[in-house]
Swiss-Prot record:
Its main location: nucleus. Residues 50-128 form the RRM domain. SMART domains: RRM (SM00360). GO terms for cellular component: U12-type spliceosomal complex. It comes from Danio rerio (Zebrafish). GO terms for molecular function: mRNA binding; snRNA binding. The gene is snrnp35. Residues 171-208 have a biased composition (Basic and acidic residues). This is U11/U12 small nuclear ribonucleoprotein 35 kDa protein.
Length: 208
């Protein structure tokens, strides 16, 4: 399979690994995500292929401010700032659905790491309905995260996979007891150098 810095299918075990090569989970969250069964929320409206995920918002940022900023990239069909159902406080992330794909692509390209109300935004495509096998953060999955949490997840825009070291690309080892071409070259060079030095010494002795 061709290597990619972003996941095409969500695998909790790979998401917990910086290069996607772990064979055992390294934290309890990965275990929880591997055992979890998750189905996308059917109550979510809109076209997932035209929807952006906007995270790391200032808790004070409002729907109106988001609409004002993101409408500069194109016409918005829907905007939902996710809030706590009890307190009404912002959960610091939102979903924005555009009317056209070119608007989504423009916002995806230009709005990521944009500073809004003194906070740097993370902007990516929606994953819940577009990435097969998706597990949300509350089940131990998700993507990104902060080092302090101890549960970093890789394979997304925020923390893409690092390309693993491919040991198969190394030169095959020569069989033991067999002189390599490089070793022969070195030996020949030493022999020639020794012979030349020995000849020069004899010449000097004869000269005197």
């Amino acid at each position: 399979m061709e290597w990619s810095p972003v996941a095409k299918v969500y695998d909790p075990l790979k998401a917990g690994s910086i290069d996607g090569t772990d064979v055992e989970p390294h934290d309890a969250g990965v275990w929880r995500a591997m055992l979890a069964r998750y189905k996308p929320n059917r109550g979510v409206c809109g076209d997932p292929d035209l929807t952006l995920f906007v995270a790391r918002l200032n808790p004070q940022t409002t729907e109106e401010k988001l609409r004002d900023v993101f409408s500069k990239f194109g016409d918005i069909r829907r905007l939902r700032l996710v809030r706590d159902v009890v307190t009404g406080f912002s959960k610091r992330y939102a979903f924005i659905e555009y009317k056209e794909e070119r608007s989504l692509k423009r916002a995806w390209r230009d709005a990521n790491k944009l500073i809004l109300d003194q906070y740097e935004l993370l902007v990516d495509v929606e994953q819940e309905r577009t990435l097969p096998g998706w597990r949300p953060r509350r089940l131990g999955g998700g993507q990104g995260g902060q080092k302090e949490s101890g549960q970093l997840r890789f394979g997304g825009r925020d923390r893409p996979f690092r390309k693993p070291i491919n040991l198969s690309t190394r030169r095959p080892a020569e069989p033991r007891g067999r002189e390599t071409e490089r070793e022969r070259d070195r030996r020949d060079y030493r022999d020639r150098r020794h012979e030349r030095t020995h000849t020069e010494d004899r010449t000097h002795r004869h000269t005197y």
